[in-house]
Amino acid sequence: MWPPRFPPPRPGMSEETRQSKLAAAKKKLREYQQKNSPGVPAGAKKKKKIKNGHSPERTSASDCQSAENVPTDHTAPAPPSTAAATMFLGVVPSPDADLIQSHDAGNCSNLMEETKTFSSTESLRQLSQQLNGLVSESTSYINGEGLTSSNMKELESRYQELAVALDSSYVTNKQLSSTIEELKQQNQDTLDQLEKEKKDYQQKLAKEQGALREQLQVHIQTIGILVSEKAELQTALAHTQQAARQKAGESEDLASRLQSSRQRVGELERTLSTVSTQQKQADRYNKDLTKERDALKLELYKNGKSNEDLRQQNSELEEKLRVLVAEKAAAQLGAEELQKKLEMSELLLQQFSSQSEASGSNEQLQQAMEERAQLESHVGQLMESLKQLQVERDQYAENLKGESAMWQQRVQQMAEQVHALKEEKEQRESQVQELEASLAELRSQMEEPPPPEPPTGPSEAEERLQGEVEQLQKELEGLTGQLRAQVQDNESLSHLNREQEGRLLELEREAQHWSEQAEERKQILESMQSDRTTISRALSQNRELKEQLAELQNGFVRLTNENMEITSALQSEQHVKKELARKLGELQERLGELKETVELKSQEAQGLQEQRDQCLSHLQQYAAAYQQHLTAYEQLTSEKEALHKQLLLQTQLMDQLQHEEVQGKMAAEMARQELQEAQERLKASSQENQQLQAQLSLLVLPGEDMDQEEQDEEVPQPSLTIPEDLVSREAMVAFCNAAIARAEEEQARLRVQLREQKARCRSLAHLAAPVQSKLEKEAVVPRDMGDSVSEESNQALHVAMEKLQNRFLEVMQEKVELKERVEELEHCCIQLSGETDTIGEYIALYQNQRAVLKARHLEKEEYISRLAQDKEEMKVKLLELQELVLRLVNERNEWQGKFLAVSQNPADVPAPVPTGSQEFGAADQQGDLREVSLADDTEPAQGEAGVPAPQENPTAQQIMQLLREIQNPQERPGLGSNPCIPFFYRADENDEVKIMVI
């Protein structure tokens, strides 16, 4: 009977439940071994079968087979008797008994059925042998070997009995065959159920096997190691028992040493806790010192500023002293002069008193009295100023005394702090020396040579003690590392103390310097007091000089202020002048270009004026010729009235033709018809009329075309209006650019118009040339020919000349207006370009300032983000440190519990035989997953017998590393490598940082 299965331990199972289950499994295994202890060969047989891979069920089946085959093997081949037949029949098992045995056997039902069938065939074989014996006897009887009747009767009775037995055996065989079939069906059903259960069980095993395979491998390795150690331990058991008696005293010594070492470890832990608390206090004290250092830095900064202010005040006071010394010298000179004047005035008074009849004595007396009153008032003012100076001197001396007392108190406080730090340093050094001495003692105790061991192997108690000693050595090494870290921290603290001592020395030097300055100031004040007597004598005579000095000082201050204002104004004006010079250079370039264009235009205008003068001279000639022709035309009034009316109608029709093309064509046809009729009527004047009409058509058509072009070209002058909704500079720049573009377009259009006007003037000149030549020819023609010229042609010429003259004047006036407009537009363009340049410069300055401010803002944001990141990192490190400390405390508590258990129960060491049972129990606790052969697995390496030592716990090293990182943040690549603005920050309740930049 195998021990019951135990489920594998859960990963979250506690240590106590695991130990209780292990104890229960060990008890059950011991009971099982006690039960199976008498049947040792059976156990060996089971071990062999386990090794060969067979199950115990097969052993039971083989036992059943051997038990049933025994009677068949021992039956004799002789013909049996009735008793033997009955015995044989009794040997055959009944089906009910077979069923009960199959149900009791469980897994060996198939083997039992095989034994049943085997026994029935054996019985049939025996019956056939008996029948063959009877047949052989009958044949012998037939051959002559006669028998008696009694034998025959016996044989017959025997035969009858055998027949009855055959019938009964036949019936029993049928029953057995039916029962065998039923059992086969049941066996098949049970086999199917078993296969299903096996499949389910295999699936469960496959699921559980993956999780438990690693544990099984570990247990297999440990079992192999223990099996390999079992023989050695059994052989060494006697030796160890003898050695145990010898080493009982040694174990007691070791126990006493362990107790002393534990006490020492407890003391070391206490000292370490005290050192850690002292270190925390030192860290807090360092933080307080850093805060005080920052406050002292601020105070030093403020004191430096106050020093600078005081130095400036000292320099001002020295200058005032120099001025006062100069005033004193001048006052002494003035006093001497005034004494001389007084003597002279006294002499004059005596003279005036002696000469009472003198007329101007009263006036001189009044002047002397006025001068005396002025001197007295001046003396009063000087006394008041002296009192004010004394009050200021007293206040300054009191301030100096208060500052010197404050600095002395600060120096005393810093000296006391330095003294306290020195005492703490000495205490820590003494503690470190004591710890080092205790460590040296422990090392000497650990390094003492152990007593010679017997040839037999060490006991488990000694191994455990050695393991505990090694663990204690490791803990001592950890404590030594912590002590070294503490020593390093103490060295860093001593270094900080040295730095603070140096700073204190610097502060003391500054205080001495201040005291020396105070002494110098006292000397200056004493000298001022000594000079006070002399100044008080000269105060009565220094009023006028002081007033002059005050006036001069006021004038000097005014001049300095004016000079500063003038210099600032000059700088601004120089900047403006530079900009204006640059703009003037650009404007001069533009003006040069415009001057060139204006010169070209002026040359063109001069050419046009010359053409105008020529045209006017021609027109005057035309007017003279016209007056000559008028005298000739007066005679032809009666005959030419109708023609004149027709010409007027014709001119009107020509005007309509110019404005309306279609009507003009019809009117032209009508005029041509009327002209043809008139030509028929006036054959004499037809040639002259045709010439005049041709000239009029040449003169009138371009003039009217020009009128139309003028009407078409009369465009309203664009007025430059600045909108009121311009707020931003960008909109102003866009508006200026648009206005400049419009002005350039208008300038181009005006240039095109000028070119067209020039072309028109040229065409008019070309038109006027033939008219002028004709007039000159007509002037040369005699009066007789002039009589032939019609009056209507002269009138038409006169009208054409008037139109031409008016058109020329209008063209010139338009040209002048266009020039003025061009100049205005150029002026507007210059102004707009200047404004755009200034706006562009302002925009560039604004962008530069904005970029600088943005860069500073980005730097501040980066610095704040770095500080926040450092703060988060410190929080994470503190959390890690807390977790590591808790872990270290838990581990130490566990080790202390183990040590206490070992020290309280040093003799409760288990024997080597129960260790094997323990391992078997642990193996059985994991579950009967597969059968392991334990008989032949006795060949593992001897080096694997020892249990591997536990790994070092790195929590203490991590704690020390985190403490170093927290104490020395400069080791991390942070803000120390980058230059930054010094400022102090403090997080409030909402974790918001308020920054005070210095």
Swiss-Prot record:
<feature type="region of interest" description="Interaction with p115/USO1">
    <location>
        <begin position="1"/>
        <end position="86"/>
    </location>
</feature>
<feature type="region of interest" description="Disordered">
    <location>
        <begin position="246"/>
        <end position="288"/>
    </location>
</feature>
<dbReference type="InterPro" id="IPR043937">
    <property type="entry name" value="GM130_C"/>
</dbReference>
<dbReference type="GO" id="GO:0010507">
    <property type="term" value="P:negative regulation of autophagy"/>
</dbReference>
<keyword id="KW-0488">Methylation</keyword>
<keyword id="KW-0472">Membrane</keyword>
<dbReference type="GO" id="GO:0048471">
    <property type="term" value="C:perinuclear region of cytoplasm"/>
</dbReference>
<dbReference type="GO" id="GO:0051225">
    <property type="term" value="P:spindle assembly"/>
</dbReference>
<dbReference type="GO" id="GO:0033116">
    <property type="term" value="C:endoplasmic reticulum-Golgi intermediate compartment membrane"/>
</dbReference>
<dbReference type="GO" id="GO:0060050">
    <property type="term" value="P:positive regulation of protein glycosylation"/>
</dbReference>
<feature type="modified residue" description="Phosphoserine">
    <location>
        <position position="977"/>
    </location>
</feature>
<keyword id="KW-0653">Protein transport</keyword>
<feature type="region of interest" description="Disordered">
    <location>
        <begin position="1"/>
        <end position="81"/>
    </location>
</feature>
<protein>
    <recommendedName>
        <fullName>Golgin subfamily A member 2</fullName>
    </recommendedName>
</protein>
<dbReference type="GO" id="GO:0008356">
    <property type="term" value="P:asymmetric cell division"/>
</dbReference>
<dbReference type="GO" id="GO:0006486">
    <property type="term" value="P:protein glycosylation"/>
</dbReference>
<feature type="compositionally biased region" description="Pro residues">
    <location>
        <begin position="1"/>
        <end position="11"/>
    </location>
</feature>
<dbReference type="GO" id="GO:0007409">
    <property type="term" value="P:axonogenesis"/>
</dbReference>
<feature type="modified residue" description="Phosphoserine">
    <location>
        <position position="697"/>
    </location>
</feature>
<dbReference type="GO" id="GO:0051289">
    <property type="term" value="P:protein homotetramerization"/>
</dbReference>
<keyword id="KW-0597">Phosphoprotein</keyword>
<dbReference type="GO" id="GO:0007020">
    <property type="term" value="P:microtubule nucleation"/>
</dbReference>
<feature type="compositionally biased region" description="Polar residues">
    <location>
        <begin position="271"/>
        <end position="280"/>
    </location>
</feature>
<feature type="modified residue" description="Dimethylated arginine">
    <location>
        <position position="30"/>
    </location>
</feature>
<feature type="modified residue" description="Phosphoserine">
    <location>
        <position position="66"/>
    </location>
</feature>
<comment type="similarity">
    <text>Belongs to the GOLGA2 family.</text>
</comment>
<dbReference type="InterPro" id="IPR043976">
    <property type="entry name" value="GOLGA_cons_dom"/>
</dbReference>
<dbReference type="GO" id="GO:0090161">
    <property type="term" value="P:Golgi ribbon formation"/>
</dbReference>
<keyword id="KW-0175">Coiled coil</keyword>
<dbReference type="GO" id="GO:0000922">
    <property type="term" value="C:spindle pole"/>
</dbReference>
<keyword id="KW-0131">Cell cycle</keyword>
<dbReference type="GO" id="GO:0000139">
    <property type="term" value="C:Golgi membrane"/>
</dbReference>
<dbReference type="GO" id="GO:0090166">
    <property type="term" value="P:Golgi disassembly"/>
</dbReference>
<dbReference type="InterPro" id="IPR024858">
    <property type="entry name" value="Golgin_A"/>
</dbReference>
<feature type="region of interest" description="Interaction with GORASP1/GRASP65">
    <location>
        <begin position="988"/>
        <end position="998"/>
    </location>
</feature>
<keyword id="KW-0498">Mitosis</keyword>
<dbReference type="GO" id="GO:0050772">
    <property type="term" value="P:positive regulation of axonogenesis"/>
</dbReference>
<keyword id="KW-0813">Transport</keyword>
<feature type="modified residue" description="Phosphoserine">
    <location>
        <position position="438"/>
    </location>
</feature>
<feature type="short sequence motif" description="Nuclear localization signal">
    <location>
        <begin position="26"/>
        <end position="49"/>
    </location>
</feature>
<feature type="modified residue" description="Phosphoserine; by CDK1">
    <location>
        <position position="37"/>
    </location>
</feature>
<keyword id="KW-0132">Cell division</keyword>
